[in-house]
């Protein structure tokens, strides 16, 4: 299946197909002329797929080198970026060459940032290997790295030339790594897609049920992301809906220490906490918090952060990218399948941190 991201200045396709990673070279040959390519990945993904993708690209006429770094959210920083820059220079990459981001969200965010800043921008594509990356972070052109102050604090908007999604690679994920991606999938059902929510309701929450329906879950999620990105590429309007649960979720990730709480886990806890307080304030319908909680728990996602420290979380919130002055654009779900922006002051945001 192909989904067109029809952004006027940079349209591209998401290709979703079981087993398509084996044809990565042929796919890329349709996008780029043979040239130098650097595969950016982490050491875990490299051990599984780097050689396979490298050989496929070489068979298609590309000159390929591989850069891998130690896996983990804590490596998504400017230190790693500098190391990638140095590798690209040693390989002699020019503005006519490109980067293949092969991995999960950490790899995709970092490799995209490198591609968008090296020589003021070179071509890149995404081959996501985690559920979170396949349904969310590989699509839409947000790139970035973390700082000690906040998640993704330094970044760019830079669209890839294409996204290649192979649902079969999810079978090599660990249980926790697969389940955390469901945080984003659940979010899509809540903010835009009641049909997806109904599908999730019918699943039993097991790893087997996720893998069996992975292609459908990915397609639904990508269609929602496509709609938001095409209408609002630079995150000024409806694309903000994609941040439901992320305001508190990002604060949890930052205060826990990057890599301790996975992104989808933090999003799940963020959705539950925001909904609980918003429901108490009459801003979200009665019973929705219970529905979100039960859905997250069914798939094995955490719904309560055990190291809840209001002061630390609030400090992290002050660096949120959705803040404009002293106002933060909070995303709420007034009914299943729709979302709204609810501006709150940073002072009011303290209410949403009360357990």
UniProtKB/Swiss-Prot annotation:
It comes from the Bacteria. Its cofactor is Co(2+); Zn(2+); NAD(+). GO terms for biological process: amino acid biosynthetic process; aromatic amino acid family biosynthetic process; chorismate biosynthetic process. Its main location: cytoplasm. Its EC number is 4.2.3.4. GO terms for cellular component: cytoplasm. Binds 1 divalent metal cation per subunit. Can use either Co(2+) or Zn(2+). It is an enzyme of class 4 (lyase). Pathway: Metabolic intermediate biosynthesis; chorismate biosynthesis; chorismate from D-erythrose 4-phosphate and phosphoenolpyruvate: step 2/7. One of its GO terms (molecular function) is metal ion binding. The keyword Nucleotidyltransferase does not apply. Zn(2+) binds at residues 184, 246, 263. It catalyses: 7-phospho-2-dehydro-3-deoxy-D-arabino-heptonate = 3-dehydroquinate + phosphate. It is found in: Cytoplasm. Keywords: Amino-acid biosynthesis, Aromatic amino acid biosynthesis, Cobalt, Cytoplasm, Lyase, Metal-binding, NAD, Nucleotide-binding, Zinc. NAD(+) binds at residues 71-76, 105-109, 129-130, 142, 151. Belongs to the sugar phosphate cyclases superfamily. Dehydroquinate synthase family. Catalyzes the conversion of 3-deoxy-D-arabino-heptulosonate 7-phosphate (DAHP) to dehydroquinate (DHQ). This is 3-dehydroquinate synthase.
